[in-house]
């Protein structure tokens, strides 16, 4: 299951203040704390989810990285790696809320259970494509930055010839109990950050993290009819899990470049059809562009600006559509510019002949004049 947006998890806006974040987290943590819901797996998951969200958004640097890159921008090891890491995410929880839970909840549910397992973070990749590519679909390669297990230590974080040792603080459980009077609360071990292991001699290649940053190349199939903002999920191609946890997923988010001619609206396409005023007056045959080539369109006599011609099935067949949409051509009658004296004289003669014919040549103008007179009367 993909990770939810951290702001959504806490139920706050993206511009929420630190105080708003803290209040939202307090409320969720108190509601879903395992000691209050001892037999609810769902409450336990929601508690962990809220804790993870606050630990990222409550940290200025991590929040900035998350706002820019999503889950991929947050160091996946921050959720708890070996002793080679500089600081985990559990400490903030203990500092800010240990006193609250110590006062509210009784003895914890369990004393151990082994190292904590974390699902890998999801990755987001923005892919810009053309409208033509979106309509037809295609296969492409993308290079995605990701954390991979270190080739030197094979993910252990320990120097060659050594191995991680059982954490002395938690005895390998990954958690410790804090006693406050008659109450106790279980927290992530501050020494091993939930792994249950300590690395006393870290791997020089990865500094004890157990992972290195590198690019991986993936094949992605873009389906025909995909629309702007849609996401393609590639299961298991996100960040690797921690302590044997499952990997996250990769989400390829589609961004369609602005087209020179067409604007997309669902499965339909729209375009402006600029025609000379002579063609608008006399009518004629025109060729209009479509994504599949050219199409003929008949312009009737007396066509006005704003008239729309509909070309059926000349739009896009959506990802889930059975039939393609339509193409709507919106007429714009072009007024000639930079006329010669001779052309101006011809137009004045033409104007005089129109005036001799009365309102029958300009029905819209007559209607507009009547509305103006009524407005001022």
From Swiss-Prot:
Its main location: cytoplasm. Its cofactor is Zn(2+). Keywords: Chaperone, Cytoplasm, DNA replication, Metal-binding, Repeat, Stress response, Zinc, Zinc-finger. GO terms for biological process: chaperone cofactor-dependent protein refolding; DNA replication; protein refolding; response to heat. The keyword Cytoplasm applies. One of its GO terms (molecular function) is unfolded protein binding. CDD domains: DnaJ, DnaJ_C, DnaJ_zf. CXXCXGXG motif repeats lie at residues 150-157, 167-174, 189-196, 203-210. Zn(2+) 2 binds at residues 167, 170, 189, 192. HAMAP family: DnaJ. The J domain is necessary and sufficient to stimulate DnaK ATPase activity. Zinc center 1 plays an important role in the autonomous, DnaK-independent chaperone activity of DnaJ. Zinc center 2 is essential for interaction with DnaK and for DnaJ activity. Homodimer. This is Chaperone protein DnaJ. The gene is dnaJ.
